[in-house]
């Protein structure tokens, strides 16, 4: 941070520090930068979080209100914003007091009140439901206050997803040419970019018909009550009706075709091998791309026109139409992007994964279509590498298996003039400070042996807890299912376990720190997100337990399509996909232990494949050099498996 600030000041640029997720972002914003301000008093910094992390003051006022008139107004605006019970209303009233008195900045992560996801979804908003400058609360809105601060800040803390969205829309952040961009935990960037560019949309025929009918009525309302100066040709009722009718017929045809690929009347998924659509489906997608883009343009034209009429019309009626048109624009934008991507055979020189899903909610069937590129190097080149002059990508795991090749393939980065790939030696003496322990497990951590393996793991873990050699411990799992199984085996130790999901991560870490500093034993238990950005030094963390080598899931449509493509190129998917990803994960997990010259301890890895498989040695060679020990494991008898088998057999008989 300090060199970045110095260079940014010298070059008169804005330093943007981006990290992998909101938790790491908030750590820099709430802890690291306030600490730096003590030695750089005039430092101006802020954070750029996504809109969904901020409270919407309009929604908060409605949910905190007990006034019927407020609810009547929101009903007219088509917003169902009423508290479910008195406790919710009181909580919202308290939050409003905190916001109004500046005790809270409106960011979900910065309140000590527990807000469940259901309530927060109504307290926050999204782009489609935001009135923007037309909102009565615009000036004091936490989201827009934070956005205005960005223009004055020297340092902006962001996350990769927000940076990608900002570069795509050319909004939020200063101009790319005026940035010094640092991408921390940069190994996540290709995956984040791929997720950001994934397009999904509902295409259920009856639902689509309803949306088109509502849009036609909305356009008619605009033409009648808020007529623009020049009438768009597509706003002509007959032309718009014909346009929407053609669009619906294509959607209905697509539904019929997709239903042939999926078992009738139940939840299902169909992936198109290598992303290759039948010719008939490809032609439908190409036509849908054109038709939805025209509706997107019409909605955008009306929205811009409506935004200029706020001073000359009934504000409540206008706001209602603005909200509805904004939501219509959001829908047609998504549809247009989806069908454009579906119409492509390749993106960044690789296939586009395409699949359809059918889900059943409340007895109703919904059909969705999804597209995502396997590679996003062209998009990263356009949005980042070519547009921002100075970028630093950092991470403990830019290399996997001691090579930059996976990063280069996924990100499109190459050794060009002025670009450098640098691997720095660790300043720590791992041989003296720690060791790796691979217990002599009887079972490999495969799905068929999961119950026995976790029972063995729990027995060894219990032995370590009872030895009382370590105050601070961390247990990392590859899946939530395995974590919950483990917790069933150690119910008597539950009070000392701080488990992911019990509270927000930063609160669990604070509680862990307090416990250890007061001489109590404390164990953090979590998934892969706990393996990154967790900085606990010395006695705060002296033993890390790793459930198994974390290979990526093999049932993802993207992973399966990439595997097909690699095989078509005579490449081995395990070598290109699975092993580098597992190496990334293992390096991050092991890296939690030694964080300073005063750190010490052990990393326990419950996976004997590190010693028995050929790839195990390669994974170990990519780690810091620790001594390796192989102690025995207490013998355990697993009875649960037999019971489960009996139950399953009983179910089959019925």
Feature locations, PLM:
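Conserved interdomain hinge at the start of the Helicase C-terminal
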Residues: 382, 439-478
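Signature of the SF2 helicase/ATPase Hel1-core->accessory helical subdomain module
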Residues: 23-26, 30-34, 127-128, 134-155, ...
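Conserved RecA-like ASCE P-loop NTPase motor core of nucleic-acid helicases/translocases
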Residues: 14-21, 392-396, 471-478, 604-606
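N-terminal targeting/trafficking signals and adjacent low-complexity tails
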Residues: 604-654
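Conserved RecA-like P-loop NTPase helicase motor core
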Residues: 439-451, 502-611
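A substrate-engagement module of RecA-like helicase motors
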Residues: 12-15, 19-154, 217, 223-235, ...
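A contiguous, basic/glycine-rich beta-loop/short-helix subdomain that forms a polymer-engagement track
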Residues: 121-154, 164-173, 301-442, 453, ...
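Conserved helicase motor "Helicase C" RecA-like lobe of SF1/SF2 P-loop NTPases
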Residues: 478-502
